[in-house]
Amino acid sequence: SDFYYLTHFPEPEAVVVLVPGREHGEYILFCRERSPEKETWEGRRAGLDGARELYGADDAFPIDDIDEILPGLLENREKVFYSMGRDADFDVHLMGWVNEVRAKARNGVHAPGEFVDLNHMLHEMRLFKGADEIKLMRRAAKISSAAHRRAMQVCRPGKMEYEIEAELWYEFKKGGSQFPAYPAIVGGGANSCILHYNENNA
């Protein structure tokens, strides 16, 4: 959710890089390119132009080119702000890119010497809400409230858990929500005593 908070970019296989003071723009997005064949089956993609035009990226590159481009963005930077440990595979890639930059030390290129945990900084930022965020949160609360009222109205003996869950999701979608902020816990009978029950299949 931190990636979405920073970019509002909804597609998979994407990486955001923020480079303070970069001449060609500070907000860089690596993402999938447009592909008519794949979009026929998987849905539309923003592509590089969409990343810039729709999501405000200063620069956008194909995700397949990240190994060639990202090491250059790390050159002569003192620090890397990153959430280490969240994605083990990406951690390995990042360390590989940093080592690639270190290998250029004889040419006068400096690698970042410090990693700073991004989680703390981002979560601190997210504590403070702007007017637009507050408006959005109020709207989300109204949608959630309507969905829970609907779930309570349809709840009857003999009703299956998944039927009640479906009513909840229906109301979320009807209210304009793209996806739920939390999983549904719909437990009947003995399942109602399980705190984080989410099978919802009885």
Model-derived regions: residue spans:
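A composition/biophysics-driven feature that prefers long, compositionally simple stretches
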Residues: 1-146
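Generic recognition of flexible, low-complexity loop/linker segments
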Residues: 3-4, 69, 173-174, 196-200
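Flexible loop/turn segments at secondary-structure boundaries
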Residues: 37, 88-90, 171, 192-195
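Active-site pocket-lining segments that scaffold enzyme catalytic pockets across diverse folds
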Residues: 126-182
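Short, basic/aromatic beta-hairpin or loop at an interaction surface
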Residues: 179-192
